[in-house]
UniProtKB/Swiss-Prot annotation:
Gene3D superfamilies: 3.40.50.880. Transmembrane segments: none annotated. SUPFAM superfamilies: Class I glutamine amidotransferase-like. Residues 1-194 form the Glutamine amidotransferase type-1 domain. It comes from Staphylococcus saprophyticus subsp. saprophyticus (strain ATCC 15305 / DSM 20229 / NCIMB 8711 / NCTC 7292 / S-41). Pathway: Amino-acid biosynthesis; L-histidine biosynthesis; L-histidine from 5-phospho-alpha-D-ribose 1-diphosphate: step 5/9. This is Imidazole glycerol phosphate synthase subunit HisH.
Length: 198
């Protein structure tokens, strides 16, 4: 069973449909026990970082999200950004799973970064065009598995142990996006040969 955390922000139904299309059972939940007992946990999100952290804290979910060690935990779009220490969007602390901060995209191109862009990675699955919608980004680090170029390098997939962050929307990225989501559900992409920043 896959638990998709429903904390009041985000495209939870679209993510649920994508996961079910891949053949998995998926529930929408904000219940501690259901999250703890799931095989995989997904933290989606669309909206403002500060609002999302407030909603997570009001539901008492920060502790369970940050304490999981035995299963994949996947953050999508804003959900990925919540994994970081701090965000300039609202000047608020995140879940502090990944070191580093969420910062405004510094690009000569229009912001938000909206539409299709290609992934750059050493992983053979991560060389496709995928769909982005965001105005903030993570900093480049050793945890980046794939990135995209938009006048600057933007982390697109990050992984630290069992935590996987996906900045783009795999559920809106066609068959390639679904294949990437499926690999994340199976545990992700990280090994010594696939880190994009090496």
């Amino acid at each position: 069973m896959i638990a998709i955390i429903d904390y009041g922000l985000g495209n939870v139904k679209n993510v649920q449909r994508a996961v079910q299309y891949l053949g998995y059972d998926a529930i929408l939940t904000d219940k501690y026990n259901e999250i703890a007992n799931a095989d995989v946990v997904i933290l989606p999100g669309v909206g403002h970082f500060k609002d999302a952290m407030q909603a997570i804290n009001e539901r008492g979910l920060a502790n369970i999200i940050t304490s999981i060690t035995d299963k994949p935990v996947i953050g999508i779009c804003l959900g990925m950004q919540l994994f970081y220490r701090w965000s300039a969007e609202g000047d608020v602390e995140g879940l502090n799973i990944f070191p580093g901060n969420i910062i405004p995209i510094q690009s000569p191109y229009p912001v938000p970064h909206l539409g299709w862009n290609n992934l750059i990675s050493k992983h053979p699955l991560l060389l496709h065009d995928v769909y982005f919608v965001h105005a903030y980004q993570a900093e480049m680090s050793q945890h980046v598995v794939a990135y995209t170029e938009y006048g600057t390098k933007i982390p697109a997939i990050v992984q630290y142990q069992n935590y996987i962050g996906i900045q783009f929307h795999p559920e809106k990225s066609g068959d390639d996006g679904l294949a990437i989501l499926n690999q994340a559900l199976k545990g992700g992409f990280q090994d010594d040969q696939t880190m994009a920043s090496n």
